């Protein structure tokens, strides 16, 4: 649609109100208004512009975005992303979830369909988190509440245990695994064994850093599962650390007298996460 006041293109979500969804719509609008205060552009969250009625239908206007990560994977014929593509996506998701966690909100519906590319041609892998229709305040979530798509559902949801913002982190881990392995699998050990052999020591170390982070996010215990802030400080996502480590390694490899050895003789999943 086109905003006649500004001339800009917007995306409009139209709710078909059958008399039973008015409360759901009201909750979604209230959630969107709360999230709108968080500086959506800075924090990688879709910009909610306004809500209005048209022909007795409730409409929500959002900024126009490109396509979802699911659409992108489908266009690629399900060829997995490489780590240099997964890294910025994960980093931006952590920023988004860190800020919504700060105001006590759980998204509850993370999946590749709800991660939108902003403009993939001009800003490759610049993403925004969308669809807060099922978002809840953590203080209002009761034990036994069923949430999240089944393939991305945290174990504490399935087991009927107390729920916190940690359920969203499980969802992020599932998305990371999906982007890297082409399909989501909870058996990471088997997935790693079937993954192509390392191409170089640099690639191998990066892969091990990614897998270590992924396993810590997919921690079965929500109390010890990494938080978004933990992940932002992780070497795999800490851009400055990653650049510095790679630069130092390249310099070492280029020295004429360099004698580089590796303790890793085959690709194996980290046996211990610290």
Language-model features: locations:
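Catalytic-loop of the protein kinase fold
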Residues: 101-119
């Amino acid at each position: 649609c086109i905003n006649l006041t500004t001339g800009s293109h917007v995306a409009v979500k139209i709710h078909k109100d059958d008399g039973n969804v008015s409360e759901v719509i009201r909750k979604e609008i209230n959630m969107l208004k709360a999230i709108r205060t968080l500086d959506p552009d800075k924090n990688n969250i879709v910009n909610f512009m306004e809500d209005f009625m048209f022909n007795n239908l409730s409409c929500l206007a959002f900024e126009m975005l490109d396509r979802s990560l699911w659409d992108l994977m489908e266009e690629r014929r399900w060829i997995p992303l490489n780590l240099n593509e997964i890294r910025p996506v994960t980093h931006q998701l952590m920023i988004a979830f860190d800020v919504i966690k700060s105001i006590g909100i759980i998204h509850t519906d993370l999946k590749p369909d709800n991660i939108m590319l902003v403009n993939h041609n001009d800003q490759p892998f610049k993403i925004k988190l969308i669809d807060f229709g099922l978002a809840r305040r953590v203080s209002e979530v009761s034990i036994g509440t069923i949430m999240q798509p089944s393939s991305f559902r945290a174990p504490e949801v399935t087991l009927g245990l107390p729920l916190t913002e940690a359920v969203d982190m499980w969802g992020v881990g599932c998305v990371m695994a999906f982007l890297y392995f082409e399909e989501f699998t909870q058996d990471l050990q088997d997935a790693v064994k079937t993954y192509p052999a390392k191409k170089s020591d640099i690639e191998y170390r990066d892969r091990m850093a990614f897998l270590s982070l992924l396993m810590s996010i997919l921690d079965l215990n929500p109390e010890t599962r990494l938080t978004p802030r933990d992940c932002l400080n992780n070497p795999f996502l800490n851009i400055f650390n990653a650049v510095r480590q790679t630069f130092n390694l390249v310099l070492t490899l280029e020295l004429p007298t360099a004698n580089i050895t590796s303790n890793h003789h085959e690709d194996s999943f980290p046996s211990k996460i610290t």
